C-alpha cells in the first residue's frame, strides 16, 4: 500500500510521463518529502530550481543530497542519502530534472 501511494504521488508530481530520473526519485523516497510545485516537508522542486537559476549547481545539490543538512531553505534538515539508496548516475539525472522544474 505504501509503495502504491509513493507511485501515485510521483505520477501526480510529474504527470503520467515519468522518466528514469523521476522513477529513481520515487524509489529513493524523495517524493515522500518533495513535490514538483508545492512545499511538503521539503521545498518544491520549482523553488529549488528558482534558487539556483543561472548557477552551475548540479555538483552542489548532489553533495547536499548525499550529505544532507539544513539551512539552505530553513530549519528542517534533509536526511543524507547514500549511494545504496540512489546511485550517482540516477542522482545526477534527478538533480538535473529538479533544476529544470
Report the location of each language-model feature.
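Classic N-terminal secretory signal peptides
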Residues: 1-18
Amino acid at each position: 500500500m505504501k509503495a502504491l501511494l509513493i507511485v501515485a504521488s510521483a505520477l501526480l508530481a510529474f504527470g503520467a510521463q515519468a522518466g528514469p530520473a523521476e522513477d529513481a526519485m520515487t524509489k529513493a523516497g524523495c517524493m515522500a518529502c518533495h513535490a514538483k510545485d508545492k512545499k511538503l516537508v521539503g521545498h518544491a522542486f520549482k523553488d529549488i530550481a528558482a534558487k539556483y537559476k543561472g548557477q552551475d549547481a548540479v555538483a552542489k545539490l548532489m553533495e547536499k543530497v548525499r550529505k544532507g543538512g539544513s539551512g539552505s531553505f530553513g530549519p528542517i534538515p534533509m536526511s543524507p542519502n547514500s549511494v545504496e539508496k540512489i546511485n550517482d548516475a540516477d542522482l545526477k539525472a534527478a538533480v538535473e530534472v529538479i533544476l529544470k522544474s
